[in-house]
Swiss-Prot record:
Keywords assigned: Amino-acid biosynthesis, Aromatic amino acid biosynthesis, NAD, Oxidoreductase
Any one GO MF annotation of this record: 3-dehydroquinate synthase activity
Organism: Haloquadratum walsbyi (strain DSM 16790 / HBSQ001)
Family: Belongs to the archaeal-type DHQ synthase family.
The protein, known as: 3-dehydroquinate synthase
Role this protein plays: Catalyzes the oxidative deamination and cyclization of 2-amino-3,7-dideoxy-D-threo-hept-6-ulosonic acid (ADH) to yield 3-dehydroquinate (DHQ), which is fed into the canonical shikimic pathway of aromatic amino acid biosynthesis.
Gene name for this UniProt entry: aroB'
Catalytic activity line of the entry: 2-amino-2,3,7-trideoxy-D-lyxo-hept-6-ulosonate + NAD(+) + H2O = 3-dehydroquinate + NH4(+) + NADH + H(+)
Amino acid sequence: MTESRSHSRRVWIKADSDVGDWKTRKRRITTGLEAGVDCVLVDPEDISRVQSLGDVSIAAFTSTADSETDSSAETEGVEEADTVVIGKESESDGTDDFPETLSASADLSAIETHSNNTVVETGAYIRILSEEYEALAETAAADASYTIVIGEDWTIIPLENLIARIGSETTLIAGVTSAEEAQTAFETLEIGADGVLLDTDDPDEIRETVAVRDATERETLELEWATVIDIERAGMADRVCVDTANLMQHNEGMLIGSMSRGLIFVHAETAESPYIASRPFRVNAGAVHAYLRTPDGGTAYLSELQSGDTVQVVNTDGQTREAIVGRVKIEKRPMFRIELEYDDDRVETLLQNAETIKVNTQSGRTAVTDLESGDEIRLFYEETARHFGEAVEESIIEK
């Protein structure tokens, strides 16, 4: 299986035989799937079971002997995994004696052989029991796509050492048992580990760890106050409503604009109205030509959005998160043209002429039908040109 969407930070959940019987493992796996973990680490015999539970990336332990004798990893079931992990019940986790020299390491040999001879990614699993095991992890990282390190005591064997030495060579996964430990792993040395391997049965810890992952990926935008200098009826246009598969809070919405350098904060339809029920999943976003800010920092045309796309939700403090587009509705509606001034620059957009469409002013949530010249509204402004939604160093005139 492949991940439907990639995170810059990853949460793996450990669900091998060390966890307990299949009932215990299954409960941990299903909780992880529901929470949104990125990968499940299991023994080979559980791969098909995990596949039947849901679509998620699967990593599977394999023995050093299997990897050395069968470089294609075609031991029973292992070839179905996305990643084969070497190091369990061997020298890397302290089960076998540590080699006299790293060149004599059976695990390192197996990792190198496997990574050179198969399309399945290779992972190294290492318990950091001493400085020798740190050196083992550093060497394994040269060949392993993922280097999983389990600290016996991160206050004694600092994660900082491993991040500094191997963080850029591999995807570094730190073993944790709680959301608090995951937060520390993601923040260490400001760079942080690329991911965590969570070992817990507590459903709350699993969900909170995924929430920590999501929080570390969110950017916080600096929203400015722009002054309304003109608002006028603009006639009929094709208006776009973005209906997400996620409920939005009262202070959330999206950034919309006719000009990519200046995007207006438009509230989600979370407020009750005398005329229509609230639609907390919807942003009445403007006309088909307008830009909407995306989670990667780019923009997309409203007309191009479709079900399954990911869009950026932002609140009035500039904190962002992601939402999935469930549906896009395009209908002919009367529009306002709203022109703003910020720092001697003028930007504008078209929004529907209806009291249910609201922006954020100094007075709070305000319907576009109540806007007046001189009002100040929330704006995200950046001095950059865009081409196909990507920032470019080029002079582009928008008016």
